[in-house]
Amino acid sequence: MQKWVCVPCGYEYDPADGDPENGIEPGTAFEDLPEDWVCPVCGVDKSFFEPVS
């Protein structure tokens, strides 16, 4: 699964890990994250993320 990085702070969202502290189960693709999900480090929305190449 594609990893995504937060451009402002460098946090990397890995679908294999999810974001359990914020209710996101492991195995959740970035595209399947809720629209109101934000970076757990700096709080920006999904539009600030880019795919990791």
From Swiss-Prot:
Residues 1-53 form the Rubredoxin-like domain. Keywords: Electron transport, Iron, Metal-binding, Transport. The keyword Iron applies. GO terms for biological process: alkane catabolic process. Its cofactor is Fe(3+). Binds 1 Fe(3+) ion per subunit. InterPro entries: Rubredoxin (IPR024922), Rubredoxin-like_dom (IPR024934), Rubredoxin_dom (IPR024935), Rubredoxin_ET (IPR050526), Rubredoxin_Fe_BS (IPR018527). The keyword GTP-binding does not apply. NCBIfam families: RubredRD. Monomer. Belongs to the rubredoxin family. This is Rubredoxin 3. It comes from Chlorobaculum tepidum (strain ATCC 49652 / DSM 12025 / NBRC 103806 / TLS) (Chlorobium tepidum).
